[in-house]
């Protein structure tokens, strides 16, 4: 058996992509080795290919050297699903970052797109504006700057009620078969040739004609079922969750267990819409609103985002810089800002200085005036539960009539119709909240042990959606942040733990409570290295990756080659 030579592998990789795109030292690999919220480990190298052919060649080199490959696009995941975790791998680990492969190809007059591995949702949204269409997800990813393929591979949900999880049955990907051989699978529905070199080069250069694009009515480029599923408000199961076997297909839900080169996706017609802001001190009000709007409008609501007052307050203070940055510079620049902050943090940590940038940003924003509209602030003070609702204009009159009549009878809440600025800021505030718990932790290290972040899908008929924790658990928590995609009954629940409490123990206690409620988790952030993959999901991973060469160990599965079983 040939002896493994790290230097020989690195030299081969450098010959493929160039020396500057093979990173090996701890500081330059830091932003690729660490998750945004969770996960970290050692790597042999981070490789950043510049073409699809280079991506294929890097993959060949990695498999030839018997390395584990972790595919990574934007690294905005929240469960460590695109970074290494721990140091107990049985083979060297390579991270392949696809951030340079940003190609987006518009086909069928904008009704569909083909996205390469590094394409971002923000860029796709900008391109589709010229066609008066939208991607599956608009600004609404927990970490702005998320990639299109990351969403598909982790069947991410998002805020848009009608669209469900990111999903396609049309993809171009590579997998390692049970004999350990690398294969390229072209299920993109585009005739591109026969050899990997020809297929990948022609795709990247868009060297195909309209006649080469195949339209098979049996193959979907989006989830056609969800708009029906979400309206079934009396069903005793969640509308969507990561381990749903009916939404796992090749690249969709693959979580890096294959190497994806491109996906083909439907786009969506842009519609004129209006935003309502709803506040209440009775959770039953929001339940009644959800059930009515999902079943009685001319068209499904576009979005319905829930914010608990405690999450509102933490987000207002500790998500302020994110909010203001996006307001000033737009979403396209957020990844650059994160990368710059990460480099500064990495440099300072060499001198044992941790969290300085967070403290500085908090100090700056503390002295800036309030960034949220006056009417939202008034509702913050009056109401515990908040719902930001967007409906198509053909449903606006009926929605307003219902809310007016409802709150005439139920004095526990109220609503207002947002101006364009209020609506935009309300949704942006909701998304800034998602990172606020991290900022709170990083600026209160002496008080905070860590964060337990849960991503849950409740049953569609569950009326008891406000969590009641046992007193024994409550006393270990400094703050609870509840927010989420209310009409989908998907909630994000961040618990900021007091110093001295074990986050893992607390998380496992939370899981037992969720099991008792027959909730599914994770709902849309995928298992990463945080959650346990349920049998259907673990079996899907093993089928895709029989040698266990890709993204090893996710979902608490085996980190061993061939899944720890004898080679068949």
Task: Name each model feature, range by range.
Residues 36-38, 42-44, 72-74, 79-91, ...:
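Conserved glycine-rich FAD pyrophosphate-binding loop
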Residues 269-303, 310, 317-363, 372-409:
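A conserved active-site cap/scaffold subdomain adjacent to cofactor or substrate pockets
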Residues 88-93, 98-101, 108-148:
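Anion-binding (especially nucleotide phosphate/pyrophosphate-binding) glycine-rich loop
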Residues 1-63, 77-113, 311-320, 373-376, ...:
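N-terminal flexible segment immediately upstream of the FAD-binding catalytic core
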Residues 146-153, 305-321, 423-430, 526-539:
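Short, conserved secondary-structure transition motifs
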Residues 22-26, 48-49, 69-73, 80, ...:
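General beta-strand structural signal in soluble alpha/beta enzymes
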Residues 129-287:
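FAD-binding subdomain of flavoenzyme oxidoreductases
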């Amino acid at each position: 058996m040939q002896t493994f030579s790290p230097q020989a592998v690195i030299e081969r990789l450098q010959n493929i992509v160039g020396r500057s795109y093979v990173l090996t030292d701890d500081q330059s690999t830091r932003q690729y080795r660490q998750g945004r919220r969770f996960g970290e480990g050692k790597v042999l190298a981070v490789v950043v290919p510049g073409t699809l052919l280079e991506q294929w060649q890097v993959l060949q080199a990695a498999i030839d050297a018997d390395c584990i490959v972790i595919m990574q696009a934007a690294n905005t995941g929240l469960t460590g699903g695109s970074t290494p975790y721990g140091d107990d791998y049985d083979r060297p680990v390579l991270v392949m970052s696809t951030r340079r492969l940003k190609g987006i190809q518009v086909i069928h007059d904008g009704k569909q797109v083909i996205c390469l591995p590094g394409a971002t949702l923000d860029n796709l949204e900008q391109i589709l504006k010229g066609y008066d269409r939208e991607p599956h997800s608009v600004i609404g990813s927990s970490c702005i700057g998320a990639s299109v393929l990351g969403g598909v591979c982790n069947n991410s949900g998002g805020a848009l009620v009608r669209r469900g999880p990111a999903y396609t049955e049309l993809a171009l990907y590579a997998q390692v078969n049970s004999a350990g051989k690398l294969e390229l699978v072209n299920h993109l529905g585009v005739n591109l040739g026969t050899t990997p070199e020809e297929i990948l080069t022609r795709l990247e250069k868009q060297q195909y004609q309209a006649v080469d694009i195949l339209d098979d009515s049996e193959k979907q480029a989006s989830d056609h079922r969800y708009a029906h599923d979400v309206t079934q408000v009396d069903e005793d199961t969640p509308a969507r969750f990561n381990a749903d076997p009916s939404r796992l297909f090749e690249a969709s839900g693959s979580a890096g267990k294959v190497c994806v080169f491109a996906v083909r996706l439907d786009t969506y017609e842009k519609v004129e819409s209006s935003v309502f802001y709803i506040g209440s001190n009775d959770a039953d009000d929001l339940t009644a609103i959800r059930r009515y709007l999902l079943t009685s409008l001319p068209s499904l609501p576009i979005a319905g985002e829930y914010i608990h007052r405690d999450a509102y307050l933490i987000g207002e203070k500790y998500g302020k810089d994110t909010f203001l940055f996006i307001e000033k510079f737009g979403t396209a620049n957020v990844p650059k800002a994160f990368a710059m902050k990460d480099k500064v943090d990495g440099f300072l940590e060499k001198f044992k200085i941790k969290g300085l940038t967070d403290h500085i940003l908090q100090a700056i924003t503390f002295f800036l005036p309030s960034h949220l509209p006056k009417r939202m602030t008034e509702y913050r003070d009056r109401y515990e539960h908040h719902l930001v609702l967007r409906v198509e204009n053909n449903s606006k009159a009926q929605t307003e009539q219902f809310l007016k009549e409802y709150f005439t009878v139920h004095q526990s809440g109220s609503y207002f119709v947002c101006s364009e600025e209020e609506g935009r800021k309300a949704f942006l505030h909701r998304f800034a909240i998602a990172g606020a718990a991290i900022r709170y932790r990083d600026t209160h290290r002496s008080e905070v042990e860590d964060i337990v972040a849960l991503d849950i899908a409740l049953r569609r008929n569950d009326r008891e959606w406000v969590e009641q924790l046992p007193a024994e658990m409550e006393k270990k928590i400094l703050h609870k942040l509840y927010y989420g995609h209310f009409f989908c009954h998907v909630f994000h629940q961040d618990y900021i733990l007091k110093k001295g409490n074990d986050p893992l123990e607390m998380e496992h206690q939370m899981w037992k409570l969720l099991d008792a409620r027959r909730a599914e988790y994770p709902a849309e952030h995928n298992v990463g290295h945080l959650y346990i993959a349920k049998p259907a999901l673990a079996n899907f991973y093993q089928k895709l990756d029989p040698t266990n060469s890709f993204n090893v160990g996710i979902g608490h599965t085996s980190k061993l080659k061939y899944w720890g079983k004898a080679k068949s």
